Each structure stands twice: as C-alpha cells, then as structure tokens.
C-alpha cells in the first residue's frame, strides 16, 4: 500500500474531524443496485472484507478510502441491440421508429441489460494531513480526485477543500531548475522531463532515462521551450514527477525510506499496513512542506 500519484487540495485546519468514526458507517459503500449504473461510498482502507474499521488515523494523518461499484455496459452493445430492434420495427411497420420512440427503446434495453451487467470494483485512497490542511488523493485524474472530495464533503456536510494552486508560474520554476538554478534543499533532478513550446499547440519534447543537465536540454531551452513535467528525487527516499498542474505522478518510495520498514514491528498484515501508512504520510508531508515555500502554494482560509 503506497500511493502512486498525488492530486492535492487545501482545506482549513480548523475543521473538526472528531466525529469521523461515528458518521462513517452512514456513508459506507452499498452494493450497486440491479437498475443502478454506479454506487460510491467509504470502505475500509484495509480492504472490503474489513467491516468495522472504515478509516485509519495516526496522529494528524487520516486515511480514507472511497470504493466504487460500476456497471460495465458498453455503448457498442446497447447500440447494436438498438439497431437490431429498430430494424425489426421498420420491417413490421414499414418505417423506422421516430426519435422519441427510439429513445424509449434504448431506455428499455438499458433497463433490461443492467441487472445482468458485470460490476467493476475500484477504490481511491486519500490521506488528510489535519495539521497542515491538505488532502493527497492517490490519483493523477483531477476528475477522480474531485469525486473523492465530493464524498468527503457529503460525509461531513461541509468540506471547503480547493484544488492546490500556486502564486507563481510552475513552468517557469521547473524550467529554472533544469537550467541550473539551485533546487530546494534535499531535492535533486531525476532522469525525466517534458518540455513544451511556449506557444499553444507547439512541439512537445519528452526525455526519459537521461541526464537532464546536458547540451541537448540546453538547446531546447535556448529556443524557448519550457518544462511542463520534471522528475525529482527527495534525498534517497522518494522519486516523483512534478507537473505544471501541480499533480505529482510516478510517486515511488525508495530504499532510504523502505529500509525503515525492516526495523519496525510489522507482525501481521495490519501492522505492516499501519507502518507503511505512517512512513508514507511522513514523507508526503515532508515533500509538501519542502515544495510549499518555493512554489508559493496556496493556503486555505480558516
């Protein structure tokens, strides 16, 4: 259990989470109904089989998991059946069904197919840092992250979380780092970047598995390309790719952090998950605080 991507939001640190244990059962994921397309709700971070514990809290860190059940009903299947049904009607009546009747037929087909459709189960994890007021959602999709925030908002009744933004140009900052400007302490360049022309629709250059301080990169900078994604390493603990959208992708925890698991008491799966969450949360906080000042990240009003 380690997050692989981070989409970040800020929320006021004055929010009260003291009742989280008592209200979570009311927002538990229920099975998707026979005639429903989707169902969402909270599940245990420790797996769907766990019915009692619907969150995990360690100090200022809160771990929530939103589970989903989605019916798989391909549009191609529905459209094929609709075409066949409309052809049968045309043969009987001598003319194709009109738009309104066609819509009714399609709705009837979906109603008929839904109870037999396969169900896809998924989960998205989120870590809330109650001390510093940010949410790290384990996805690179803004839409999926907003779904998690919406579930938390429904749970609490109010959750004024806003997408993370910066007061400076992230592209300009990333470009300056790759051009040789000093990076924040403990950060080093990785071996991957994406560069774009400043003009809309311009060329995009992607570099992987290479040194980023080199003549080839310098030539792209000289003609005005800017860095839109940049691989970075936090000590020997965390590697990641920071985008100009402030989404952290390809998050990977390295030996410097993982070695600490060998010295922790992880007797059993639950204890190991607890230890992993504690270490991961601490590293995400360290990374967030390290980036907060140079990138002038937004704060939420308390």
From Swiss-Prot:
The keyword Transcription appears for this protein: no
GO CC, alphabetical: bacterial nucleoid; cytoplasm
Keywords: Cytoplasm, DNA recombination
A GO molecular-function annotation: double-stranded DNA binding
Compartment annotation: Cytoplasm, Nucleoid
Pfam families registered for this protein in UniProt: RdgC
Gene Ontology biological process terms in this record: DNA recombination; regulation of DNA recombination
Domain of life: Bacteria
PANTHER family per record: RECOMBINATION-ASSOCIATED PROTEIN RDGC (PTHR38103:SF1)
Recorded family membership: Belongs to the RdgC family.
Reported function: May be involved in recombination.
Name under which the protein is recorded: Recombination-associated protein RdgC
Species this chain originates from: Xylella fastidiosa (strain 9a5c)
Taxonomic placement: Bacteria, Pseudomonadati, Pseudomonadota, Gammaproteobacteria, Lysobacterales
Gene: rdgC
């Amino acid at each position: 259990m380690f997050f692989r991507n981070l989409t970040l939001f800020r929320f006021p640190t004055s929010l009260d989470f003291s009742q989280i244990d008592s209200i979570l059962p009311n927002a538990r994921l229920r099975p998707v109904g026979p005639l429903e397309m989707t169902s969402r709700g909270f599940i245990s971070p420790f797996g769907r089989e766990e019915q009692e514990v619907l969150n995990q809290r360690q100090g200022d860190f809160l771990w929530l998991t939103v589970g989903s059940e989605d019916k798989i009903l391909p549009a191609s299947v529905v459209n094929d059946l609709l075409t066949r049904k409309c052809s049968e009607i045309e043969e009987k009546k001598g003319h194709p069904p009109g738009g309104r009747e066609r819509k009714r037929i399609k709705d009837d087909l979906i109603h008929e197919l839904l109870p037999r459709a396969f169900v896809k189960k998924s989960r998205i994890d989120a870590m809330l840092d109650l001390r510093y007021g940010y949410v790290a959602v384990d996805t690179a999709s803004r839409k999926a992250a907003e779904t998690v925030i919406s579930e938390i908002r429904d749970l609490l009744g109010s959750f004024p979380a806003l997408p993370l933004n910066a007061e400076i140009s992230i592209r300009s900052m990333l470009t300056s780092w790759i051009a040789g400007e000093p990076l924040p302490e403990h950060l080093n360049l990785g071996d991957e970047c994406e560069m774009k022309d400043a003009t809309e629709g311009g060329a995009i250059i992607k570099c992987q598995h290479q040194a980023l301080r080199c003549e080839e990169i310098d030539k792209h900078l000289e003609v005005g390309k800017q860095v839109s994604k940049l691989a970075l390493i936090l000590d020997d603990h965390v590697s990641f790719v920071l985008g100009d959208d402030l989404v952290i992708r390809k998050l990977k925890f390295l030996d410097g952090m993982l070695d600490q698991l060998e010295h922790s008491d992880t007797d059993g799966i639950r204890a190991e998950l607890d230890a992993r969450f504690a270490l991961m949360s601490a590293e995400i906080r360290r990374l967030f605080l390290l980036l907060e000042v140079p990138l002038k990240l937004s704060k939420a009003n308390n």
